[in-house]
C-alpha cells in the first residue's frame, strides 16, 4: 500500500495542531468568561458558588457517610478519617431499577435511596444504629447523627452548603416532579420517614470532592487550590477570594460561614467558549457537535473529554476509510472491515483505544492491530494502517491535553496564585489524565507557553492524582459543613 494513506493521516493530524499563540488566546478568553461568571448569573461559565469555605489539612477525624447518585448505580459509603491523611472506606453499590429512573414520583426514588442507606447502616454500623433506635425509644435527649455528603451529579442551582434545586435531569433520568425542588430536602424527607440517624449535611459536586480529597491525603503548606477531572467529562473547581465574587451580593442563598474569606467555585468549564470564539474547530468537531444530543453546548468538553475523543477519532478514520484507502486490502494486507464494525456507528469507539494506541512502541504496532480487532472488529490491519491510526490518535490526544492547560493557566493567572513562592497544589482525576500516556506532560508544555506562567510558574504547580471525590471528598465536605454550622451557631 502506498504511503498516500500516511500522507493523508499527517495532513488531518495537522488540523489538530493547537499552537502556543492559540493557547494564549484561549487563556485570555477564559479569564474574561471566568470574571463574567463571578459577576453575574446565566453566563457561559457558570462559576457556581459551592458554599464550601475551607479545605482540609489532613488532620480531620471522624466517621462520615457519603452517597453518590450519578448514573445507573447508587453508591453508599462510610469513611473513617483517621486524622493523619489516611482513611478507611466501606461501601456498597446497587443498580437503580429502571422504573424508578423515569417514574411519576420523586418520592419513590428517594425512598429507595433512603432504604439503601438503612440497609448499609444495619450491615456495617449496626451497633450505632441499634443504639440510636434504643435512644429514640427511650426518648433520651441529644441524638448522635451521621453527617452525610450527597454527591448528586445532575445540574443543580446551589443555594447553600446543603441546599440545591434540580435544574433538569440528564443521563436517562426523567422524574418531572423533582425539577425545581431541593434535592437535599427530598433525600432528608425520605431518611426522616424511615427514622434514620442521618443528616444530609452537604450537597457535593464530584469535582469539588476531588479537590477536598487531594487536600486531605496530600496536604502541602497551603492546602489544595484546584481540583480537575479529565475523564468521561471534564470540569474544575478552585478556591476563590470572596471579594472577587460580586454575584454573592445578588443571588438568593442561605447563610454561610464568611470567616475564611474564601469559597470553592465550581467552574463547570465544559461549557467554556460555547460560541467558539477561540476554540479549534475541525470538520470532525463540527460533525460531532451537529450529531450530538446537545448541539452548541459543552463545546470545550467536546474537544477534551474521554467521551468525545473516541468519536472524533472514529469520524476521522471513517473519512479516511471512505475516501483515502485506509483499511483497504492491498499488496501487503488482507485487511477486513466487517459490515457490523462499530467504525460505522456513532459513539462506536471507546476512548480507551486511544490510550492503547498512543502507548504502542512495538516496531510493527502489534498492540494497535490487536486493539483495532478488539474495538472495531478490523482484522489484519496493515502496519501502514496502524501508523496512520497512531498519527491521528496522537494528534487528537495531544490537542486535548494542550486545551486542558487553558483553564488551568487562566485560573492561576486570574487568582494571582503564582505571585508568591508557594507551591500550588492541583488534584486531578479521570481516565484520560490517569491512563493516556504523557497527558500531563503535554498539558505542562502548553502551560509553559503562557508568558504569565512560563517555566518558573510551571515549576510551582504540583499535580497529583486524587481518587474518589464522590466518596472521601463528599465525606470531607460533610465534615466542613458541620464545622461551619457549629461556627455560625456560636457566632449567633
Regions of interest found by a model, annotated:
Residues 141-190, 194-199, 219-223, 232, ...:
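Gly/Ser/Thr-rich active-site cleft segment
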Residues 86-91, 171-180, 211-321, 327-331, ...:
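Glycine-rich phosphate-binding loop of actin/hexokinase-like ATP-binding domains
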Residues 95-114, 118, 127-132, 156-219, ...:
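Glycine-rich phosphate-binding loop and adjoining helix at the ATP-binding site
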Residues 1-91, 95-144, 192, 217, ...:
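ATP-binding/phosphotransfer module of carbohydrate and carboxylate kinases, centering on a glycine-rich
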Residues 77-79, 160-163, 239-241:
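Short, solvent-exposed loop/turn and secondary-structure capping segments
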Residues 64-68, 147-149, 200-202, 225-229, ...:
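Short glycine-aspartate micro-motif
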Residues 59, 67-75, 153, 207-208, ...:
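A short acidic Gly-Thr/Ser loop motif
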Residues 8, 31-39, 52, 60, ...:
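Contiguous N-terminal and early-domain "leader" segments and peripheral loops that mark the onset or edge
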